[in-house]
Regions:
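N-terminal structured subdomain of primase-like DNA metabolism proteins
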Residues: 1-92
Length: 92
């Protein structure tokens, strides 16, 4: 699987598979409690149309690869391996 194909994995579905659901949602995006740190007010935004995320409290964002790197404190290559693992929600 190429890096571009991996980046197409749906962030919303990935978060849902991890049990992380939006606090507020519109057709184009959702606000979540950050999966990267403790917080009481949702400041983690996922743009569903661009398949990108941004944590306003931490000042970081990016693709699903960046999200996995931050969530699991792993490097780029380990994140690619993680996202290629069987059982992960995929985009066809």
């Amino acid at each position: 699987m190429s890096i571009e194909q991996i980046k197409k994995n749906d962030i919303r579905a990935f978060l849902a598979q991890a049990g992380i659901t939006p606090v507020k949602e519109t057709p184009t995006g959702g606000m979540y409690l950050s999966p990267l740190r403790q917080e009481d007010t949702a400041s983690f935004h996922v743009d569903y149309t661009k398949n990108r995320w941004y944590d306003h409290g931490a000042g970081v964002g990016g693709s699903i690869i960046d999200l996995v790197m931050h969530m699991h404190n792993i490097d780029f290559l380990d994140a690619l391996c993680y996202l290629e693992a069987p059982g992960l929600v995929r985009v066809q």
